Amino acid sequence: MPHILVKLWPGKTEQQKKKLASEITKAVMATLDDSEESVSVAMEEVKAADWTEKVYKPEILAKRDTLYKEPGY
């Protein structure tokens, strides 16, 4: 606990994804007072053409009450 899933468009390098995972892990540890061993981070690439149907509608619009940071689009 916790497990964080980041959905993003393809095209980011492995180095960028590893850095993002590291920074998310640090933020979770500092904010929630969890150990590094308790944090897991996954990345799921979603094509831009599929974003609306696979991410925006089911996970953003349909679950607005669970969002702590909404997108600006």
Put a short name on every predicted segment.
Residues 2-73:
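A domain-level signal for the structural core that forms small-molecule/cofactor-binding pockets
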